[in-house]
């Protein structure tokens, strides 16, 4: 082991270390082998079925009318993940031929007349026939389990055949797990960039996420132990088109014994308002044993995303490790500001910030239009007086202008308090509830008479809405000369279950929502100016290929980890946090900026006046300069495991004011690691008022290091140094 002792991280200082190592890599390719070791213990029409996938052991109880998961365990160290009887699935069906429609649950653990478990070459096939409910006789389910011995993983598929003339399949709950505490248990779930919470098996814990969206950005979760024998279970819904689904994780009590963590994925069925609709899982569900933490779980998901996800950029779009269709100016931005108002109000302030920061700046411009915010959408034009001239002036000074528009909403009273074009033009393309009424949302904006503004959610599959958004975007890029357009809510708000049969999609679930936006954005990208960019709000993953940037302003929670950047770093630019006020605003400013840096995000999205304050400007200039020297790692590289630091490192706590008071506690010493080819950059940022000391532990093999010579470069507070030859021994020596 080598100990690199970092002597001091001074007050508000940021020290950065770049290691360059020459390593030989031997690429081995091997065919994936699917295999399962199985055992059956039968008696009285019942059997106990065991499926062994490498070191992951599963046991099922099969009865004439049910199948139950009895246990799931790490066979190597005898760590139990599931010890309480758990259903494989639950179906929710609705009787459609009665006025008082009620949803009926049917699970794998009861309610079937015929159940079978057939052993296959690589696992099992479970079949469920003839539900005991007399009117459900034409519903059957097939669940296929495949064991991958080499990966210690179980792969699941489910198909529901519904030949009922009166029942519609509404939702499929699959997978379904009741996880026992693995010992010092930790849960990773996909809110924002990914969030890790401890002690979730005790107390009152509940996470509910609607995918895809900013608060449920990915299709996987993980639970693992943080003790000396790390063992974890990765649960991934590997759906390559990102169909709408809900992830629910909650702490529940099963009887009088220890509490369990109930994890379910609930998927709305396509054509959920029509009797006789079927369901087939597009892709597969994966349970995989891993030994590590959130970073290892993220890498499992990344491996699948790069290989199969329809939204991941490939080919000419992502060549030589670089997102080629994103303009160079967008890739190379290091800092953003945002503000609101007329050209006279915003131009002097933004230009002054550009002068102070001495770097190119991205500018997110709100309220450039004459209509009020969140009102009279989508009638943004005419813009405020001299808007185009202001755009030209700012961009002449290396300020890249990105105006706000909404990509999802049409005001139901779209000319003051009058219904101007909504009913006559837009209503046919609005999303509809099953009763035929449009889905309508309100966000706090008011009409002149004090009533809430009611905004209809538009259906992205309709040509009317696709063409309207395209018209607005091209007006801004071509007529007004902006370098980017921000299209709000696309990667933030989850799909609504539109039931309008005149639209070109099945009612309810499926991936049609994503595919509608893909077509819209593809059409825009095909005709937009080559050097322009498209961005949107938050980081719901299925739109990455069609966007150049995600506004990650909502990454504001305790316990958040950079799982999303570990998966998508370089595939899209992530920028922006909400920077706000309060008595701890300066500390919160440093915490957010430092976290953005180590996460690989472009910095800022603050008001120019806040960032220009003397107590913030010095720190910001250092961190922007440092990012400019290492941005190639974020654009073309890949996140590596954050370095392991030891010592008496203090914590800091500040009110981030995300929603009222919003206290966030972090380490005072932020750190991260990124790799590009044979080089690794280790990043450290001290945000506290005191000098902080820490010890960095490096094991043989970390960051590709072997016992050899290496080049060391240190960038401190944005100041580069010459490379120095060093030797890194990995026995009992220490390098200081």
Residue ranges and their predicted role:
Residues 46-134, 185, 296-302:
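Acidic-aromatic substrate-binding/catalytic surfaces of carbohydrate-active enzymes
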Residues 713-736:
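C-terminal beta-strand-rich structural cap/linker in extracellular carbohydrate-active enzymes
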